[in-house]
């Protein structure tokens, strides 16, 4: 069993994420798994010859969980895992990394033959083989796929390559907040128009709710853009994005009622939409530059 490449697979935070549970009705066959994550994982396993899956997730401990996972794998053309990692008791110093190390020892597999897909970091001396995903931010994404392919093909992870992957992950986090903000603003604008046309209390409430939601995502993007800028600095890129939407969007028409204030709020929602859309375009362009840089090409 010591030939080929091995993927040690966690499930929660890799093949699903916190948004998955809001969409359970979409697919009742595997409501705890995300179709987009499964599709990307399928792409990964079919892009590498002689690759094997070893299940390291806590799902391996519950038969019904494994049955659901196997059914989802079958639908997405993913081969079933060849084995599961051993379960270590807490008195044995149980960590995910130690369980994987135990499996490697028992099966005579080298560390450079493996990658680990997991949202946890308790990997002991295997952290350099970890591709860490994020349960709160989409699980297994395109950037993780690219990193996994890079490692499984035996490419050396240089400092520059590592920094590019980190910048790409930061770009994805930033885009996630920006797209959520834009969706909330789009909804707020629709409710705002209805409110101006005399929609009543419900329309006003829904408008305010969506504006508040957008403000949360806009506030969140501040931290993600700061991290993105830092990662870009590490790869000699630059970014300059301004999203000054202002607190007035939150509360202006809470205390004042009238057509002038309603139009003022509507105007500022439109301004915020434009700012967020421009920021998305800028980040998407920089992401494209990073991907070309990763592939050894350049974009003017």
List each model region and its residues.
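Amphipathic alpha-helical coiled-coil segments
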Residues: 161-178, 182-185, 214, 218-221, ...
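Active-site neighborhood of HAD-like aspartate-dependent phosphohydrolases
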Residues: 2-47
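C-terminal cap/substrate-recognition subdomain and adjoining C-terminal extension
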Residues: 67-156
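Short, basic/hydrophobic alpha-helical segments
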Residues: 38-49, 102-110, 199
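A short acidic (Asp/Glu
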Residues: 18-20, 64-69, 125-128, 206-207
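Substrate-recognition element of Asp-dependent hydrolases with the DxDx(T/V) motif
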Residues: 48-66
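Alpha-helical coiled-coil oligomerization motifs
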Residues: 176-179, 183-186, 190-193, 197, ...
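Long, low-complexity or tandemly repetitive, helically biased scaffold regions used
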Residues: 190-212, 216, 226-274
């Amino acid at each position: 069993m010591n030939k080929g490449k091995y993927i040690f697979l966690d499930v929660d935070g890799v093949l699903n994420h916190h948004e998955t549970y809001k969409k359970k009705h979409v697919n009742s066959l595997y409501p705890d798994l995300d179709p987009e994550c499964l599709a990307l994982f399928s792409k990964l396993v079919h892009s590498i010859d002689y690759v094997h899956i070893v299940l390291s997730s806590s799902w391996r401990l519950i038969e019904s969980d494994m049955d659901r996972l196997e059914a989802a794998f079958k639908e997405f053309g993913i081969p079933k895992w060849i084995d599961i990692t051993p379960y270590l008791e807490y008195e044995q110093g149980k960590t995910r990394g130690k369980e994987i190390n135990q499996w490697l020892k028992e099966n005579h597999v080298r560390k450079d033959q493996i990658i680990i897909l997991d949202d946890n970091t308790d990997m002991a001396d295997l952290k350099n083989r970890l591709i860490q995903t994020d349960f709160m931010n989409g699980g297994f994404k395109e950037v993780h796929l690219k990193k996994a392919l890079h490692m499984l093909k035996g490419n050396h992870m240089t400092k520059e390559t590592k920094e590019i992957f980190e910048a790409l992950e930061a770009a994805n986090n930033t885009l996630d907040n920006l797209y959520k903000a834009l969706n909330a603003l789009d909804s707020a604008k629709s409710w705002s128009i209805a409110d101006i046309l005399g929609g009543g209390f419900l329309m006003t409430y829904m408008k305010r709710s969506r504006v508040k939601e957008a403000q949360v995502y806009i506030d969140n993007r501040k931290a993600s853009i700061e991290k993105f800028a830092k990662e870009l600095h590490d790869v000699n890129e630059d970014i300059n994005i301004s999203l000054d939407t202002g607190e007035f969007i939150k509360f202006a028409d809470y205390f004042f009622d009238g057509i002038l204030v309603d139009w003022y709020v509507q105007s500022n929602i439109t301004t915020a939409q434009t700012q967020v859309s421009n920021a998305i375009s800028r980040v998407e362009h920089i992401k494209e530059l990073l991907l070309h840089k990763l592939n050894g090409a350049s974009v003017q």
